[in-house]
Amino acid sequence: MANFVEKENIFLRIAKYLFPWKGDKPAEIIRKCIFLGAAVVLIVSLVMIISFYGSTAQDNKLNEQISSLYHGSASVTIDPVKKDELVKEYPEVNEEFLPLLEQNKDVIGWITMGDEDSPFVDNVVVQGDDNEYYLDHNLNGDYSKTGTVFADYREKITAENTPANIILYGHNVNTGEYFARLTRYFNYRTQLNYGMDWYRKYPTITFNTLYRKSTYKIFAGMLVNTEEKDGEVFYYLQGRKFKNKAAFDDYVAQILDRTTFYTDVDLKYGDNLITLSTCILDYGIDARWVIFGREVREGED
């Protein structure tokens, strides 16, 4: 009984020390409230951090599985009936996409950048019915903080149509996945091997759709405001199609006026473009870092 009373007294003393108590002076009540507020903030922050990295770890595991399906490092067996159905639905599809289409028919391609044996971008690309869903959903349709790389829904990528400018969106994830390392083309942190050094090492983008394989030469990169309150807004998303040469030339000129680095890549009306867009939180929640590429022409190195 004595031990029980002693334990009860210990808990009571702890409670009186931590929580406002009858008889406390105003200064003591303020101290306890500040302490409790800080403790709540710390606990919530820890829960959010654990949740983020736990979710990211799950997403990374899923991405590894998806990558093994596409690159053929996993043993893949598609049900013959299902395969026949997919081939009938997508008669011109490159066969390496069939296992991914079996999982999700929004799949439209695969993007790769970097060294062949250790790319810094290596992701499946989907195209949905809007530009919102895949911001926070993975390929399986489950909620995901890191989402999935996706193409702008307004210009459909089909066997018959390759948009004049394919626009892809991907998150800038703290752990370095998805489009995080695109910001290395921008030497805003004055890191060695960033900016032009990074461009010289990795000057191209490989984007294979269900129907064609393409390499793009990077020709520009820029920091973009999306809200007028933050300064000039360049509506780079409007350059999805070009009604004539003048429209194309004007769009390219505006890009080259704003780029943070310069290349010797030439452009002409009729070239297919690719645009990669990601957030760059160092400049605010509404800022974007955007990379532009031009498809390698037939017969060009």
What do the predicted segments below correspond to?
Residues 1-77, 279:
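Gram-positive cell-envelope targeting signals
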Residues 45-301:
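Solvent-exposed, non-transmembrane regions of membrane-associated and secreted proteins
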